[in-house]
Swiss-Prot record:
Name the record gives this protein: Glutamate--tRNA ligase
Reactions it catalyzes: tRNA(Glu) + L-glutamate + ATP = L-glutamyl-tRNA(Glu) + AMP + diphosphate
Quaternary context: Monomer.
GO cellular component, one term: cytosol
Needed cofactors: Zn(2+)
Record: residues binding Zn(2+): 108, 110, 135, 137
Short motif 'HIGH' region, span: 11-21
Residue sites binding ATP per the record: 248
The organism of origin for this protein: Dehalococcoides mccartyi (strain CBDB1)
SUPFAM superfamilies in the cross-refs: An anticodon-binding domain of class I aminoacyl-tRNA synthetases (SSF48163), Nucleotidylyl transferase (SSF52374)
General function of this protein: Catalyzes the attachment of glutamate to tRNA(Glu) in a two-step reaction: glutamate is first activated by ATP to form Glu-AMP and then transferred to the acceptor end of tRNA(Glu).
Motif 'KMSKS' region location, chain numbering: 245-249
Subcellular location: Cytoplasm
Family: Belongs to the class-I aminoacyl-tRNA synthetase family. Glutamate--tRNA ligase type 1 subfamily.
Length: 487
């Protein structure tokens, strides 16, 4: 093993990557970048029965979306490839047969039916389920359907120092003679990960806490194969708000679902970094560069992290507000295109969207909220109850007169910008003996069809003179058609 820091993210394509899985990838990436080391991606595709088509692509898409670039792995290559375990099968068989030849592993001929019955009987007797080692000393050879099991030492302990949890000790007698090579010639996770971590010169293994009980098995394999083991660090679990294991019932779990829901990659990197790590007890917003600079295992918690959806939304809103109008518009376009009102408006283009985004940037927490906040700035097909044009303290006649006066004042403006509009419309309210809010409210409804909308005059400036005057004229027509009220 070299002195260089080399870490790996080794997902199994048995499903689409969830946030806990990607958090592990990110901690490995941060550790590598902080230490000037290498981040390797290895696809552990040896479980053929549970293999999910498209999962590898989803894994790589998630990494690319978050900017977790890898130094070796799929699409990159490297000196220690191939980086798909299904392409490394001869290495695992060679290691397994070496262990058999040295008396450290053995062929097991027990059928699946026999093993199922064994497990049922053990459970009935309230014993821990496990293999009874009946083939351990029989000296059996290879045959169809046989597996290779590792010979666990029957006494003693296996201890190691976890870089997060400190000294950890396991009794060997409580370990099972686990399978290392299956009957189909594919290795189990235990053998494949050990063989590959050694072959790829992995210096540190940062993985989820759920793999902690497997560590003694791996250390025994390292010793039996004559390898030097890497250093281990087991990351804390991620729990839902109710402190149960994070699952679909808490909301989205697939990383790509968060992308589709309108979360920014910057947000996800920042947020996931705080699920088990903290720089101090108060700082919550970090740039990517700061995370790389500050990240260290000494500040990774031993206790489970709680996934807080409200905090995620808050953080995403904060990041949205830091974007330039151009950047936000580029990111918003795919979401706006999905809204039929906007798509059919004839106004959806990048230049126009750059003007729209500052109007709603402060209100959005996710990109998928943008369309609902601004569709009426694109679409002229706005409908509303004309009664909304009448302030509750005014009559229809007063409101109609006010709208006509405002329309005439706006039409006469030499410059149709927000400052000029406010400069002329605010005094008009006084002339009409109205409060500014009353006149502004009428204009807001007339120009947007909404009672709650982005800043009025800035919105009207983006709409432009022609569209604004047309919308106000339509409002006057609608109001005129209502029965007259008498005060």
């Amino acid at each position: 093993m070299t002195n260089e820091v080399r870490v790996r993210y080794a997902p199994s394509p048995t499903g689409y990557p969830h946030l806990g899985n990607i958090r592990t990838a990110m901690f490995n990436w941060l550790f590598a970048r902080h230490n000037g080391g290498k981040f390797i991606v290895r696809i552990e595709d040896t479980d053929r029965e549970r293999y999910v088509e498209g999962a590898v692509e989803s894994i790589l898409e998630s990494l690319n979306w978050l900017g977790l670039d890898w130094d070796e792995g799929p699409d990159k290559g490297g000196d220690y490839g191939p980086y798909y375990q299904s392409e490394r099968l001869p290495l695992y068989r060679k290691a397994a047969e070496k262990l058999v030849a040295e008396g450290k592993a053995y062929y097991c001929h027990c059928s699946s039916e026999k093993l199922d019955k064994m497990r049922e009987d053990q459970i009935a007797r309230k014993e821990p389920p496990g293999y009874d080692r009946c083939c351990r000393d029989m000296g059996l050879g290879q045959k169809e359907g046989a597996v290779i099991r590792f010979k666990i030492p029957l006494d003693g302990q296996t201890a190691f120092t976890d870089l997060i949890r400190g000294e950890v000790t396991f009794d060997n007698a409580k370990q099972d003679d686990f399978v290392i090579l299956k009957s189909d010639g594919f290795p189990t996770y235990h053998l494949a990960s050990v063989v590959d971590d050694h072959a790829m010169q992995i210096s540190h293994v940062l993985r989820a806490e759920e793999w902690l009980p497997s560590t003694p098995k791996h250390l025994m394999l390292y010793k039996a194969l004559g390898y030097t083991p890497p250093l281990y660090a087991h990351l804390p679990m991620i729990l839902g708000p109710d402190r149960s294991k994070l699952s679909k019932r808490h909301g989205a779990t697939s990383t790509i679902e968060y992308k589709q829901a309108g979360y920014l990659p910057e947000t996800m990197v920042n947020f996931l970094s705080l699920l088990g790590w903290a720089y101090d007890d108060k700082t919550e917003l970090f740039s990517r560069e700061q995370l790389i600079e500050y990240f260290c295992l000494e500040k990774v918690s031993k206790t489970a992290a709680i996934f807080n959806y409200e905090k995620l939304d808050w953080m995403n809103g904060m990041y949205i507000r830091t974007l330039s109008a151009q950047d936000l518009a580029c990111r918003a376009m795919p979401f706006l295109e999905k809204d039929v009102r906007i798509a059919a408006s004839g106004h959806l283009n990048l230049d126009y969207t750059v003007k729209v985004m500052p109007l709603i940037q402060e209100r959005a927490k996710k990109l998928n909220e943008l369309a609902e906040l601004c569709w009426f700035i694109y679409s002229d097909d706005i409908s509303y109850d004309p009664a909304l044009l009448i302030d509750k303290k005014l009559t229809k006649e007063t409101s109609l007169s006010a709208l006509k006066a405002a329309n005439a004042r706006l039409e006469a403006l030499p410059n149709f910008d927000a400052a000029s509009m406010e400069e002329h419309i605010r005094p008009l309210a006084a002339e009409l003996e109205l409060k500014p809010g009353q006149l502004f409210g009428m204009l807001r409804t007339a120009s947007t069809g909404q009672q709650v909308a982005p800043p009025l005059f800035q919105t009207m400036e983006v709409l432009g003179r022609q569209r604004c005057l047309w919308r106000i004229a339509m409002a006057i027509a609608r109001l005129s058609e209502m029965p007259f009220q008498r005060s």
